[in-house]
Every structure is written in C-alpha cells, then in structure tokens.
Amino acid sequence: MHHHVKKSYINSQFGQVHYQIYGEGIPLILCHQSPSSLDMFNSAYPVLASLGIQSIGIDTPGYGQSDGPNSQPKILDYAQCVVDVITSIGYDKVSLLGHHTGACIVAEIASFRPGLINKIILNGPPLLTQDEKQKMLQMIEKAPSLTLKKDGSHLLKLWNKRIKFTPGWTNLDAMHNGIIQMLRADKNDIFGFKAAFDQDLESVLMRIESPTMILTNTADDIYFAALRTKELRPDFIFKELQDGTHDIVDEQPTQWSKCIADFLK
C-alpha cells in the first residue's frame, strides 16, 4: 500500500527545520537520537501507517536536513523548535516519541507545554548520573575527529567508531545509515549529546503529568537508565523488547511499532 509522504520546512531560531508527515491517523511526533535524523525511523513509518498512526518525523536542528545552531544549544531550544513544527502544522494535540536525545526533548515539551500533548513515549530515556554523563562525554570527545584523507580512510575510521559504539550490532543497513547521518551532522554532531547531558532530566521527568510509556530494549546501551526511569516514575507504563541495540527501530520495526500503536490506542 502506498502512503502519502509530505516533506516540508518551517522557520526557527536556528534557520529552517525539516520534517516529514507519513500516512494518516493518530498524529505522532518522532524525535531522533544523536547524531541521527528522521531517517532513523524509516523502517517504522510504513508499519506505523498500517496501524493507523500518522508519523511526523523531525530533523533536530543541526541534524539531517535542518539548519544548525553555531553555538551549543540547550534541550529547551530543540524542544521549542519541535513545538514550532507542531503549531505550524496546526495540530491541537499530538503524541510524542523520542529516542535517547529525542526522549530528553520530548520530556522537556511535556513539562513546559502539557496542553499540546495526548501521550508521551520515552524510548531509552538517558537518566544518567553526573559520573556516567562525564564518562560518556569523554568517550565521545576522545573519539578521533574527522580529517579528510585522499585515500578515503577517514570513512573507515568513522565506520569503526560507530561499530565500537554499537556492541552486538546486526543490521548493516542501520549501520550504513548511521554513518550517513554522522557525516551530515559534521563538526557539530556533539551538540545533541552535550545538550542532553546538560539537562536535569530527573526534575523534568518528575514534572510530567501526561500519560507516559517508557519503551526500551534489553541490549540497548543505556537499558539501565530506562530501568532507573521506571523506578523514578512507577506510574509510567513500562515496555521492553528483547535484545537489539540503539538501532532497535531497524532491527525490530514491527514489534517496536506495535508497542507504540497499542499504547496510543
């Protein structure tokens, strides 16, 4: 079945923000992890559409085909851009899903614009201690920066870097697409991580009053943080898929989409 896809841009504080609308049905905003783009949900868009969900994928400023900030933004800045997309399309109320950094953005929106929201899905919320944030940031900052080489060896370096950050990976398409998104994000690909680590996610989570589901998978690199979120907010629905990595959408698109549809309906 062919589903209608509409791609568009809106103006934001950082320039133009790119988004796409896929299918018809219950509107669901999708916010991606870092460094990625709305393409991280490509395997799920048709499945969600077949389940009666209209997906609105958004490229966070600085990623995918959105213009980027020149200096370090906060999660609140990214969140405001997502709200701008929602209001510009004209939705009264939407549900939102965010994966990793996207979960930070979605939680932020739920805490400062609750009137816009039907339901929230936190996919792998990065509820980390200061120590864990510090270690992860050091790992990310220590990774060699991209210097172009005539023999193309810089591309292999990037490939190996993503493999190192994806233990237990199985999906070649997801790995390839991940590399494309890293190349697109270029020198500022760290902005999303830094914004996420700067946010006080715990206090933001405590302010959420919308119906919320934590969605995770048991071999996600921050699975433990989802369990921690469940402890913090036992009132949130908790759903976990088996195995998988941070490429779970490519690895298990049908199971992933069904969890979402069950919750939204």
Predicted regions and their residues:
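N-terminal cap/lid segment of alpha/beta-hydrolase-fold proteins
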Residues: M1-Q16
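Conserved loop-alpha-helix segment in the C-terminal half of the alpha/beta-hydrolase fold
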Residues: L48, T212-D250
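Conserved alpha/beta-hydrolase catalytic His-Asp/Glu region
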Residues: D131-E132, K149-M206
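Active-site loop/oxyanion-hole signature of alpha/beta-hydrolase fold enzymes
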Residues: S50, G57-L97, T101, K258
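Post-His helix in hydrolase/transferase enzymes
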Residues: V249-D262
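Flexible "cap/lid" loop of the alpha/beta hydrolase fold
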Residues: A107-F112, N118-K149
